[in-house]
């Protein structure tokens, strides 16, 4: 007990020494630095677009397995970077690439939300060998993103255009599907006719009467080919219109 008493006495002396030190009184921002409030709650009458500027989207889910190419790309990016989440009080560290990505379009990502922003970014990524921005974009996802952005950042006339673009997209998608099915049907018919002609050309005993009994004539074949070319032209026109719609929506998202 004597040994323990000596330690307790030493602790008591140290506490008295600490209490006797001159500490300055709490200042104006002491509580703000120690607590974790939303910064926009400290400012009165904030707008939705102002609150979006001071919020950071949640980080995307981390991949459990990385390919050898991804690991090779991550090797040079080993410099420590720190990202502060103002609303959630989160401090994350990562490589140079992750920090620059987190800072890019932060306000837009915060408004869209993590899932919707990830879906849009997946659609805008080009596949290997494609031009940048030529990925498969889900138009419905883009329109939902436009609606959420316009609710925070009002753009005159943008919300009125969304249902028009959605209706036009659905109509042209249905028309494109119809013409694609029609082209496939005509192509199958042409292949079947070509195969029958090859079989007939290989048979030297076919008489002219048998040839006349064939249901498709040369004129019918030319007519079918012309119809296929016309359908293919309409399909290309529809695809050009759909690309124009994608460009319009991309312009709305970039505003």
From Swiss-Prot:
Record note on quaternary structure: Component of the DASH complex consisting of ASK1, DAD1, DAD2, DAD3, DAD4, DAM1, DUO1, HSK3, SPC19 and SPC34, with a stoichiometry of one copy of each subunit per complex. Multiple DASH complexes oligomerize to form a ring that encircles spindle microtubules and organizes the rod-like NDC80 complexes of the outer kinetochore of the outer kinetochore. DASH complex oligomerization strengthens microtubule attachments. On cytoplasmic microtubules, DASH complexes appear to form patches instead of rings.
Source organism: Chaetomium thermophilum (strain DSM 1495 / CBS 144.50 / IMI 039719)
Main location: nucleus
Residue segments, region Disordered: 53-81
Gene: SPC34
Stated name of the protein: DASH complex subunit SPC34
GO CC annotation, single: mitotic spindle
Function description: Component of the DASH complex that connects microtubules with kinetochores and couples microtubule depolymerisation to chromosome movement; it is involved in retrieving kinetochores to the spindle poles before their re-orientation on the spindle in early mitosis and allows microtubule depolymerization to pull chromosomes apart and resist detachment during anaphase.
Keyword Ribosomal protein listed: no
Assigned protein family: Belongs to the DASH complex SPC34 family.
Composition-biased stretches (Polar residues): 63-81
Keywords assigned by UniProt, alphabetized: Cell cycle, Cell division, Centromere, Chromosome, Chromosome partition, Coiled coil, Cytoplasm, Cytoskeleton, Kinetochore, Microtubule, Mitosis, Nucleus
Cytoplasm among keywords: yes
Localization per record: Nucleus; Cytoplasm, Cytoskeleton, Spindle; Chromosome, Centromere, Kinetochore
Tree of life domain: Eukaryota
Coiled coil region boundaries: 176-248
GO process terms (BP): attachment of mitotic spindle microtubules to kinetochore; attachment of spindle microtubules to kinetochore; cell division; mitotic sister chromatid biorientation; protein transport along microtubule to mitotic spindle pole body
